[in-house]
C-alpha cells in the first residue's frame, strides 16, 4: 500500500491529513494531522465516526453527500465545507495525484537530442 500527505481548504483553516491506500488505491485509513476548524462542528472531522466513513472507498466514491449514503461519504451535519475539504480536496485529490505519479513510474523522460 501507499500513504500520501494531502490537504484541503476547510471553513476556517487548511486541513492537513495522511491518506493510506492499498495497491488498488482503495482508502484504508485517513488521519488528520492539523486543522483549526470550528469547535463542535468542523472539528468533528477528526472523530472516528467520520474517519471510518472513508474505509474501503475508491476515488470515485470520495464524494460528500448530505444525508444517508452507503457508497459515498456522508457530510457532518453543520460542517459540509469541512467534510468536503477532507473528502474531495484532501482524500480524493491526494489519491488521484498519487495514482498519477505512480502510473508514470519507471517511464523515462526524453528531451530534445543535441
Tell me the role of every PLM-derived stretch.
Residues 1-114:
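Flexible, solvent-exposed loop/hinge segments and secondary-structure transition points
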Amino acid at each position: 500500500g501507499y500513504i500520501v500527505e494531502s490537504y484541503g481548504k476547510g471553513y476556517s483553516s487548511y486541513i492537513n491529513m495522511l491518506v493510506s491506500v492499498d495497491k488498488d488505491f482503495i482508502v484504508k485509513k485517513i488521519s488528520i494531522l492539523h486543522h483549526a476548524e470550528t469547535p463542535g462542528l468542523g472539528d468533528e472531522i477528526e472523530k472516528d465516526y467520520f474517519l471510518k466513513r472513508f474505509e474501503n472507498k475508491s476515488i470515485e466514491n470520495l464524494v460528500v453527500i448530505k444525508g444517508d449514503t452507503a457508497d459515498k461519504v456522508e457530510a457532518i451535519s453543520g460542517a459540509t465545507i469541512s467534510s468536503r475539504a477532507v473528502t474531495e480536496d484532501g482524500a480524493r485529490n491526494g489519491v488521484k495525484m498519487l495514482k498519477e505519479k505512480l502510473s508514470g513510474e519507471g517511464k523515462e523522460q526524453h528531451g530534445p537530442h543535441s
